[in-house]
């Protein structure tokens, strides 16, 4: 857990418990920009303290979860279109090179195992995605598309949790959403058709994120014990399918 949350009336204070990636500054910068350019899409930032903590307004809605309905996907597409319509001026870039390096390192470690997880790690490393670190379509990258970070009020969706935000690539961000473990119950095809990412780049970006997730939930990963038995094996099969094209 990177933070704790305290709610008092119409305000919320987020107290960071770790900030090695400069999370407080990233979140503050993103919220300041977005609250000016896209009012009511994100919380309005109020204060940033050195402890560090960030106080912001509370947004209406309930976190998304499970399988998204067509209405929810439409609203999510609207929210993402609004988010990505804002020029990412002044935001620090997403550190995609660090993600790639971390994924390679984690998958290399998984090669020491056996079974489908080791096979997927070997296969990914033998078919590594091309360089995705050059930003072709710059956007405000949310950075953490866990479904719980999208608040649904029955009509529209608002977005929270920008501690990993920055300047990023639109196609890579779409792949990040589709490959997030929290979204596995949803058929993302309608939203992907609407957002229309560059096909080849999208496929390779999905491979990157799928490999990253395997390093998180595979043996020895930081989230290895947070999911039901068989989750890592299922993820390994997903990696193999994506790499195969």
Stretches found by the model and what they are:
Residues 35-38, 83-91, 132, 181, ...:
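A general structural signal marking secondary-structure boundaries and capping sites
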Residues 16, 59, 146, 163, ...:
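Anionic group-transfer/hydrolysis microenvironments
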Residues 86-143, 232-242:
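An alpha-helical support segment within catalytic cores of ATP-dependent transferases
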Residues 2-95:
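ATP-binding pocket architecture of kinase catalytic cores
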Residues 51-69, 85-88, 104-110, 211-227:
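A glycine-centered beta->alpha junction motif in the catalytic cores
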Residues 3-7, 127-172:
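Active-site acidic catalytic loop and adjacent metal/ATP-binding pocket
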Residues 171-198, 207-226, 234-238:
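Active-site activation/catalytic loop segments of kinase-like enzymes and analogous catalytic loops
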Residues 29, 72-73, 158, 175-178, ...:
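Glycine-rich, phosphate-binding/catalytic loops in enzymes
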């Amino acid at each position: 857990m990177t933070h704790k949350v305290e709610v008092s009336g119409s305000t919320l204070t987020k107290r960071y418990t770790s900030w090695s990636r400069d999370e407080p500054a990233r979140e503050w910068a993103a919220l300041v920009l977005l609250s000016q350019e896209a009012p009511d899409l994100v919380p309005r930032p109020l204060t940033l303290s050195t402890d560090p903590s960030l106080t912001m307004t509370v947004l209406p809605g309930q976190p998304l979860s499970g399988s998204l309905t067509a209405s929810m996907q439409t609203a999510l597409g609207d929210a993402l279109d609004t988010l990505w319509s804002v020029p990412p001026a002044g935001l620090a870039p997403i550190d995609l090179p660090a993600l790639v390096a971390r994924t390679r390192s984690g998958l290399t470690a998984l090669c020491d195992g056996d079974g489908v997880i080791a096979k997927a790690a070997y296969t990914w490393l033998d078919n590594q995605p091309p360089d995705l670190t050059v930003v072709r379509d710059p956007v405000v990258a949310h950075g953490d598309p866990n479904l719980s970070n999208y608040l649904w009020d029955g009509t529209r969706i608002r977005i929270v949790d920008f501690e990993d935000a920055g300047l990023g690539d639109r196609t890579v961000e779409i792949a990040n959403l589709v490959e997030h473990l929290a979204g596995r119950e949803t058929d993302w095809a309608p939203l992907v058709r609407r957002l229309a990412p560059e096909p080849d780049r999208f496929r390779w970006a999905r491979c990157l994120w799928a490999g990253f997730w395997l390093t998180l939930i595979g043996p020895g990963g930081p989230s290895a014990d947070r999911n039901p038995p068989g989750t890592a094996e299922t993820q390994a099969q997903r990696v193999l399918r994506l790499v195969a094209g």
